[in-house]
């Protein structure tokens, strides 16, 4: 583990003064805007992962490249690698099984269900901060071991897919039968900036489980994937870790059975490494010197590798066959008396005091040791609920195998979204509830059907505001992090979404559209909801003097209630949706920051967010029908009035509540209140970046561009979950 003392500094008193004391003239050096204004709005989050950072170009099609892959040969190469021990990082017992399982586990384990961010889906373990987290010590070596294989197969396999597949092959090579593997994870080329890893400034700062439940964080300590293996705050108490384990695994959407299976399964193979104190360990990859070439944690203890390796500081081997699958974890857990001890590095762990020396040494076949366990392993024996599950798995190894296979598949695929995104020959046929399954299409509407449906919607008596609002309510649940939500499935008509306060419009509009769907029987309700938005926007554009056809791709289906996990879908309920001027809680960030958060989840750029907010305001789509931000005298017309009036210096804005959430815009001459607004409205005039964008649409020549840009951004949101079109 690295400390502040480990940070490498190339400057010293004896060096050339140019390199020592001269002004840094490099791009990006010097005091930055955020140094002066640390609360500056993070509009830059909407510019992540653009084509400018992608060396493969916007025409690269990963699914197409993957189809050219010799999948069997790749798995064969991975299997061979497992026992191809390298002298620069020798394999324990001659096998990298445990190392590759840990690499896959720690890549996927950053996922959190509360906001859908994290996970293995984009290969983020290659970048900071994850590449240098204390919990990821030595995984830099695992990735380097994979490099020759990645180099051989090139872009036919992404790093993100390769990390998880390597873990699967490791399990299979140990004799375990996995549930399957779905490829389809596309690499990105820079760190995710939108993931909130926490506010702590020091590694391994403890978080109370109750606090963890209120935040979108996946670990109980900064820099860990899950929990401190020595117990909360190094307590050494197995029972004290139970709440932390439930909190962190629960934040991933795992129940108690899945949690027990994952902990036990992950600790059936491999070992931890703690040959000596952490003071021997050098800088992490991000802080290591340039000649280290991205490798970190160089150890000065002995050879620094093999028997002398230091990773977590714990020195634990759980089972008698650490490279072969078994039920020894549970057998040892319940068979022996466990006594607290310390590793050579000083970390708290447990040893089976009454066990014979039955554990093989990883490098000396003539040596044996007693079984050892982590503090958190013993939680599975001493917590009453975990203990029941553990004993069942002890007595029924097949039940354990099945539970781990399914939990591992869920762990490694949870952030991939619907099954339609999976590719490859090992995709399981079974639909799983956490995949948000969808039925097969019942309708294939023709162009004539669509024309007739649009006419029926237009004649239904619904207003532009209602039609646009219901379509947005359906589609805007999408989360780019784990690809959940969206309009496909029409889950707006099901629990829990139909009853959300933000979706009040559904109670008025859905009965009309449901009746129309039953009468015509030509399209799914999901398609009709989106088509209603099309009709509303085309009417609003025509009223503004612009004739435009809003693109519409039919083919959505209607999910059933039994295909909808109410608890998991409840996590999609927004705290705020600035596009609809909705804010449920004032104790979570600022309104404008939550608007950025929502836009980022919808994969919108800053210009797309800007044009959508401006358009939706003049169309009157506020969730509660309020006039906040409706800066127009002609609501329902797709005009640029929002921008023109927001930037008009005739109006002076002042807050009307103590929280500074609501504002009045008064005529500077008469004092008359002309408009009301929220922070989600005024930010487009106050933030310098967003104001620059608003000015584009406020110009006299922007009307037609505004309509076209609005339609393009709108269609993007409506189709975010159309993975069937890939």
UniProtKB/Swiss-Prot annotation:
Enzyme Commission code(s) on record: 1.11.1.21
CDD domains noted in UniProt: catalase_peroxidase_2
Cross-link (Tryptophyl-tyrosyl-methioninium (Trp-Tyr) (with M-252)): 105-226
Cross-link position per record: Tryptophyl-tyrosyl-methioninium (Tyr-Met) (with W-105): 226-252
Reaction equation(s) it catalyzes: H2O2 + AH2 = A + 2 H2O; 2 H2O2 = O2 + 2 H2O
Ranges for region Disordered: 1-33
Cofactor comment: Binds 1 heme b (iron(II)-protoporphyrin IX) group per dimer.
Pfam families: peroxidase (PF00141)
Binding of heme b, residues: 267
Catalytic center residues: 106
GO biological process terms, semicolon-separated: cellular response to hydrogen peroxide; hydrogen peroxide catabolic process
GO molecular function annotations of the record: catalase activity; heme binding; metal ion binding
Matching InterPro entries: Catalase_peroxidase (IPR000763), Haem_peroxidase (IPR002016), Haem_peroxidase_sf (IPR010255), Peroxidases_AS (IPR019794), Peroxidases_heam-ligand_BS (IPR019793)
Annotated site residues (Transition state stabilizer) in this chain: 102
GO cellular component: cytosol
Keyword GTP-binding among record annotations: no
PTM summary: Formation of the three residue Trp-Tyr-Met cross-link is important for the catalase, but not the peroxidase activity of the enzyme.
Cofactor: heme b
Keywords assigned by UniProt, alphabetized: Heme, Hydrogen peroxide, Iron, Metal-binding, Oxidoreductase, Peroxidase
Quaternary data: Homodimer or homotetramer.
PANTHER family: CATALASE-PEROXIDASE (PTHR30555:SF0), HYDROPEROXIDASE I, BIFUNCTIONAL CATALASE-PEROXIDASE (PTHR30555)
Family recorded in the similarity comment: Belongs to the peroxidase family. Peroxidase/catalase subfamily.
Function (record text): Bifunctional enzyme with both catalase and broad-spectrum peroxidase activity.
Protein name: Catalase-peroxidase
Species whose genome carries this gene: Salmonella arizonae (strain ATCC BAA-731 / CDC346-86 / RSK2980)
């Amino acid at each position: 583990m690295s400390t502040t003392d480990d940070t490498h500094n190339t400057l010293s008193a004896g060096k050339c003064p140019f390199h020592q004391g001269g002004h840094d003239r490099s791009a990006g050096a010097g005091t930055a805007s955020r140094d002066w204004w640390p609360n500056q709005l993070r509009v830059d989050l909407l510019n992540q992962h653009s084509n400018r950072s992608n060396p493969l170009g916007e025409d690269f099609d990963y699914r197409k490249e993957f189809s050219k892959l010799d999948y069997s040969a790749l798995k064969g190469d991975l299997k061979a690698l497992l026992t191809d021990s390298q002298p620069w990082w020798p394999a324990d017992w001659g096998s990298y099984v445990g190392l590759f399982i840990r690499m896959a586990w720690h890549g996927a384990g950053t996922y959190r269900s509360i906001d859908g961010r994290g996970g293995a889906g984009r290969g983020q373990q290659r970048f900071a901060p994850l590449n240098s987290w204390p919990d990821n010590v030595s995984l830099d070596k695992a990735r380097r071991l994979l490099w020759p294989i990645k180099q051989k197969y090139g872009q036919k396999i992404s790093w993100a897919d390769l990390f998880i597949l390597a873990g699967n092959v490791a399990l299979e090579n140990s004799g375990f039968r996995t549930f399957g593997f779905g490829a389809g994870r596309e690499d990105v080329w820079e760190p995710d900036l939108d993931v909130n890893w926490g506010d702590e400034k020091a590694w391994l700062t403890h978080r109370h489980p109750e606090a963890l439940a209120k935040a979108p964080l996946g670990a109980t300590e900064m820099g860990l994937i899950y929990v401190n293996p020595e117990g909360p705050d190094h307590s050494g108490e197995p029972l004290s870790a139970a709440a932390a384990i439930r909190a962190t695994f629960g934040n991933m959407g795992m129940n108690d059975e899945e949690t027990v299976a994952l902990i036990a399964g992950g600790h059936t193979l491999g070992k931890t490494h703690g040959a000596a104190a952490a003071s021997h360990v050098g800088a992490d990859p991000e802080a290591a010197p340039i000649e280290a070439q991205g490798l970190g944690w160089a150890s000065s203890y002995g050879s620094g590798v093999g028997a002398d390796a230091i990773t977590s500081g714990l020195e634990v081997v759980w089972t008698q066959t650490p490279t072969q699958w078994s039920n020894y974890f549970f057998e040892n857990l319940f068979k022996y008396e466990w006594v607290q001890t310390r590793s050579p590095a000083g970390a708290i762990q447990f040893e089976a005091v009454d066990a014979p020396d039955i554990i093989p040494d990883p490098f000396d076949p003539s040596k044996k040791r007693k079984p050892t366990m982590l503090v958190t392993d013993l939680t599975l024996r001493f917590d009453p609920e975990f203990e029941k599950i553990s004993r069942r798995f002890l007595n029924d190894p097949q039940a354990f195998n099945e539970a781990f296979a399914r939990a591992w598949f869920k762990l490694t695929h949870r952030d991939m979204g619907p099954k339609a995104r999976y590719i490859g020959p090992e995709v399981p046929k079974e639909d799983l509830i956490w995949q948000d399954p969808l039925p097969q299409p019942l309708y294939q509407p023709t162009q004539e059907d669509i024309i007739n449906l649009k006419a029926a919607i237009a004649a239904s008596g619904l207003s532009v505001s209602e039609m646009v609002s219901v379509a947005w309510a359906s589609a805007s649940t999408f989360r780019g992090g784990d690809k959940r939500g969206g309009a496909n499935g029409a889950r707006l008509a099901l629990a829990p979404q139909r009853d959300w306060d933000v979706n009040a419009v559904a109670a008025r509009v859905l009965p009309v559209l449901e009746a129309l769907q039953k009468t015509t029987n030509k399209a799914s309700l999901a398609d009709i909801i989106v088509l209603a938005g099309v009709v509303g926007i085309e009417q609003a554009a025509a009223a503004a003097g612009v004739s435009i056809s809003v693109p519409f791709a039919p083919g959505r289906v209607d999910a059933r209630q039994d295909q909808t996990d109410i608890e998991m879908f409840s996590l999609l309920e927004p705290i705020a949706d600035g596009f609809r001027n909705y804010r449920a809680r004032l104790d979570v960030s600022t309104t404008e920051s939550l608007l950025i958060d929502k836009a980022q989840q919808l994969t919108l750029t800053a210009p797309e967010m800007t044009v959508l907010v401006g358009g939706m305001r003049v169309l009157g789509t506020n969730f509660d029908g309020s006039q906040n931000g409706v800066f127009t005298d002609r609501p329902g017309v797709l005009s640029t009035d929002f921008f023109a009036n927001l930037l008009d210096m005739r109006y002076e804005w002042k807050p009307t509540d103590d929280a500074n959430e609501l504002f009045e815009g008064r005529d500077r001459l008469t004092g008359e209140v002309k408009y009301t607004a929220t922070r989600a409205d005024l930010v487009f005039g106050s933030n310098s970046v967003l104001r620059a964008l608003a000015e584009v649409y406020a110009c006299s020549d922007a009307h037609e561009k505004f309509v076209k840009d609005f339609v393009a951004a709108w269609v993007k949101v409506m189709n975010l979950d159309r993975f069937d079109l890939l």
